[in-house]
């Protein structure tokens, strides 16, 4: 079994094989489905606007082209893509071109299986291969699981911006984390 595969036994003790691979544009509908669910149901992404088909393709294409879009899928499932990770532009100014921001999302059924950690590890390597220098994580400060995950992979907390955002009627603090890729 390769480092990007994992066999996980569920309640019925049926082994499922999860595989991480580079995303393609054919994965766009599945990525959009997972991302839009997070838009509706979580505080992880600070927008209430779901992506449509064209918006999802335009957002995903540059990261697919540079090799910093990954998916995790489970063999034999009808909706086999159960998560994704991307490293995309942190800022539009060219001086920030080698600094990217990570985003990792899993469907609820795929959470708690170590797949987020596998995606983050693979994304760090993909970003390194793409020539990126710094990986940034912008995390809702109350999301301790995400903060701990990033710490495990060498990210340090740069700071917390109080009251940086708002979603679902809640005022949210933002934890900024970074990791060198060199």
Predicted stretch roles:
Residues 3-4, 25, 49-109, 120-121, ...:
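Acetyl-CoA-dependent GNAT
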Residues 32-59:
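Conserved GNAT-fold acetyl-CoA-binding loop/helix
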Residues 112-127, 148-152:
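Conserved acetyl-CoA-binding loop-helix of GNAT-fold acetyltransferases
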Residues 19-33:
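A short beta-loop-alpha structural element at the N-terminal edge
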Residues 5-7, 98, 153, 163-182:
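C-terminal "cap" of GNAT-fold acetyltransferases
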Residues 111, 137-147:
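Conserved beta-strand-loop-alpha-helix junction that forms the acyl-donor binding cleft
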Residues 127-139:
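Conserved GNAT acetyl-CoA-binding A-motif
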Residues 86-89, 94, 136-139, 156-173:
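Conserved catalytic-core motifs of GNAT/GCN5-like acyltransferases
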């Amino acid at each position: 079994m390769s480092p990007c595969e994992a066999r996980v036994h569920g309640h019925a003790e049926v082994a499922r094989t999860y595989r991480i691979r580079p995303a393609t544009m054919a994965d766009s509908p599945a990525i959009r489905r997972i991302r839009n669910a997070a838009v509706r149901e979580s505080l992880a992404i600070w927008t209430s606007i779901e992506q449509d088909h064209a918006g999802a393709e335009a957002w995903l294409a540059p990261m697919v082209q540079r090799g910093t879009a990954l998916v995790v899928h489970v063999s034999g499932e009808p909706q086999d893509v159960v998560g994704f990770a991307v490293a995309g532009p942190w800022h539009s100014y060219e001086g920030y071109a080698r600094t990217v921001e990570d985003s990792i999302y899993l469907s609820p059924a795929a959470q708690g299986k170590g797949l987020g950690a596998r995606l983050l590890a693979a994304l760090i390597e993909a970003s390194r291969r793409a020539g990126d220098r710094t990986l940034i994580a912008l995390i809702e400060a109350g999301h301790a699981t995400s903060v701990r995950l990033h710490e495990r992979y060498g990210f340090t907390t740069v700071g917390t911006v109080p009251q940086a955002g708002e979603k679902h009627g809640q005022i949210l603090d933002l934890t900024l984390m970074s990791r060198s890729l060199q």
